[in-house]
From Swiss-Prot:
GO terms for molecular function: DNA binding; DNA-binding transcription factor activity; sequence-specific DNA binding; transcription cis-regulatory region binding; zinc ion binding. The keyword tRNA-binding does not apply. It holds the Pfam family zf-C2H2_6. Its main location: nucleus. This is Zinc finger protein AZF3. It comes from Arabidopsis thaliana. A zinc finger (C2H2-type) spans 75-97, 118-140. InterPro entries: AZF1/2/3-like, Znf_C2H2_sf, Znf_C2H2_type. One of its GO terms (biological process) is response to cold. Keywords: DNA-binding, Metal-binding, Nucleus, Repeat, Repressor, Transcription, Transcription regulation, Zinc, Zinc-finger. Induction: By abscisic acid (ABA), ethylene, salt, cold and heat. SUPFAM superfamilies: beta-beta-alpha zinc fingers (SSF57667).
Amino acid sequence: MALEALNSPRLVEDPLRFNGVEQWTKCKKRSKRSRSDLHHNHRLTEEEYLAFCLMLLARDGGDLDSVTVAEKPSYKCGVCYKTFSSYQALGGHKASHRSLYGGGENDKSTPSTAVKSHVCSVCGKSFATGQALGGHKRCHYDGGVSNSEGVGSTSHVSSSSHRGFDLNIIPVQGFSPDDEVMSPMATKKPRLK
């Protein structure tokens, strides 16, 4: 009886038939075909199924050369021949070679150290930009006109100094009642703090 079971052709479910049905049922779209048309009453024997699989493999071609794994491009350093996975990583690595050898003439990534031509006339400090020098000079004067000649901001400070106060200096907190200016409107109430 065991020999008869081994020699008799076995019935095998068609895996492609069920894959197609699953695709139609997943879409949830109605078809004009009835479900009985989708299901074939024909069941494959094991031999037919194996023959069908061999036909599918034969159609594929089976060339192992055609199935190539997509290799990631590698970028190689021209100096030490190290390889990197990205061009940006190679660029960062090349910068290390430039710093080791003292840089090149065509190296445009490093900032140039220009001669500092803006010199403070009070203390002699030099600055790269005139704006930095102007900000530095504010620490030398206490709201009054500086003694240095040839500074463009001196005339501006002297023209505003006739008012008796400088907006750049923190105001003095203590006022006497005599220093307070009264408003011409008598009905104006004092501001609450």
